[in-house]
Amino acid sequence: MAIDVKAIEEHIKGILIALGDNPEREGLKDTPKRVAKMYEEVFKGMCYTNDEIAEMFNVTFEEDLCVSDNVGDMVFMKDIEIFSHCEHHLALMYNMKVAIAYIPKGKIIGLSKIARIADMVGRRLQLQERIGSDIAEILKMITDSEDVAVIIEGEHGCMTTRGIKKTGAKTITTTLRGKFNTDTIVSNKLMMLYTK
């Protein structure tokens, strides 16, 4: 799916008029075009399904990989900074940090690809909970591992700048699949690494 930049420009112009402003005035005359270009960038992830994102970042390594059933064999990455926009108010979700872990099953994904997946999934109209589920699903597709965990901490503009206006309120979500959900030793190790 391609983003319809021209339609966005027209709708932003209409919003400016609905707000009681003049979209032809000096400070606003290029605003519809700028917003459309920004939306094309910040919502880039909406152009791709989870399957397509998995295909895009499917760079794995299998040779010389010694992975055992030992619970110590875990790939863990944290403090991946992303942003997103909530689908309810189009408000920014910011100061988001993602931690991702998986237990390899014969192949590993390139580390930069993990961060790229998180970034691309965030570039959609989202719920924080769905970001975690989407990342876990894509990582499972690429690595064939059922054992995936995603922890996300973030602030939501819809909570901090409107409504209840609780600045500093953070939301933490967890998506736990496979052993991260069923094996206490594995989940304890995950939490130890996350809080380290």
Swiss-Prot record:
Per the record, the pathway is: Cofactor biosynthesis; 7,8-dihydroneopterin triphosphate biosynthesis; 7,8-dihydroneopterin triphosphate from GTP: step 1/1
Report which reactions are catalysed by this protein. Answer: GTP + H2O = 7,8-dihydroneopterin 3'-triphosphate + formate + H(+)
Tell me which species this is from.
Answer: Clostridium botulinum (strain 657 / Type Ba4)
Q: Any idea which UniProt keywords this protein has?
A: GTP-binding, Hydrolase, Metal-binding, Nucleotide-binding, One-carbon metabolism, Zinc
GO MF term set: GTP binding; GTP cyclohydrolase I activity; zinc ion binding
Q: Which residues of the sequence carry a binding annotation for Zn(2+)?
A: C86, H89, C158
Gene name of this polypeptide: folE
| Annotated EC | 3.5.4.16
Q: Name one GO cellular component term.
A: cytoplasm
An example Gene Ontology biological process: tetrahydrofolate biosynthetic process
Q: Which SUPFAM superfamilies match?
A: Tetrahydrobiopterin biosynthesis enzymes-like
- In terms of superkingdom, the source organism counts as Bacteria
Which PROSITE patterns does the record match to this protein?
A: GTP_CYCLOHYDROL_1_1
Family, per entry: Belongs to the GTP cyclohydrolase I family.
The keyword Nucleus is annotated on this UniProt entry: no
The entry describes its oligomerization and partners as: Homomer.
The protein, known as: GTP cyclohydrolase 1
Q: Which InterPro entries match?
A: GTP-CH-I_C/QueF, GTP-CH-I_N, GTP_CycHdrlase_I, GTP_CycHdrlase_I_CS, GTP_CycHdrlase_I_dom
